Amino acid sequence: MSLTFLHILIISATVFAVIGSGFYVSRSVRSSAGYSVAGRSAGASLVAGSIAGTVVGGGATVGTAQLAYSFGLSAWWFTLGSGIAFILMGIFYAKRLHNTALETIPQYLELYYGKKAETLSSIISSIGILLSAVASSLPGIEIISALFGLTPFLSALLLMALVIAYTFFGGMKSAAVSGILKMVIIWISLFISGAIAFLLLQENNTLSSFPASHFDLMGQGTDSAMAHLFSVIVGVLCTQTYIQCIFSADTPLKAASGCFIAALIVIPIGLPSVAVGMYMHAAEPETLPILVLPTFLVNHVPVLIAGL
């Protein structure tokens, strides 16, 4: 797997566009509330963009393809579970949380359980966000190392710089606008890639070579599937990153609508990665599982789409 100059050019332009959009929006941020909760003026689209842009990272794309390479359709549980969590958030959480006019989960818990609960929840929430960030970053580090020949340490530094640039200048508002642009790019590139993978699977008549478990959401066992679903739902509902998006909404209705729109965006986005993972398992079984998606993009997808 090697990148052409055009690949690198398109990748650079895409990164610049996503980060640049956030930097442009940051000029309108004038207060701490504007930074942390977008001035509580976000519409449903911005709420959805910030939520979806946060959850759809390396785990939802590269990680899903990696699992699909080994297990098939059951790799869909991450994005499917995230979407279900957003629906639950919109139904049960959005209105109640938004009406408190707070900014964090610990602040909300302090209202009912006191200062000790706030302190403890702050520590637990920070650890949870750290673990989530690590899980999302590992695929990115591996891909940067493979594509550009950098050491894991340098790849981690580069990824860290990009993540900081993504939100540093404008906070929640930058994350929301960048998230919308990021979702457009990912939807276009992934669904075209998924369609190509599915057509290749049909052309080569390889679908029949997979065991039945690869076409079953419960292919890894019902207990395992439910454990995946439960862990994703709990992780989403308890994570400050997603709750903060609700606090940034203009009205409770827009907060709930943003959650539902995010669910519509996130739920189907795992399917193209599943198709890619299954094709690569059949056609290029020597590929490292974590490099399944980038390898497919470079080798089988037009440069313009692959670069995105």
Identify what each model region corresponds to.
Residues 1-61, 167-171, 183, 189, ...:
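Membrane-interface "cap" regions at the ends of multi-pass membrane proteins
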Residues 8-12, 48, 75-80, 119-120, ...:
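Hydrophobic alpha-helical transmembrane segments
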Residues 53, 76-170, 231-232:
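Helix-loop-helix module between adjacent transmembrane segments
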Residues 2-26, 38, 42, 66-102, ...:
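Extracellular loop-to-transmembrane helix junctions
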Residues 18-25, 89-94, 136, 163, ...:
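Structural signal for membrane-spanning alpha-helices in multi-pass inner-membrane proteins
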Residues 2-3, 37-42, 46, 63-73, ...:
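Loop-to-helix junctions at membrane interfaces in multi-pass transport proteins
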Residues 15-18, 54-55, 82-86, 126-129, ...:
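Residue-level recognition of pore/gate-forming positions within transmembrane alpha-helices
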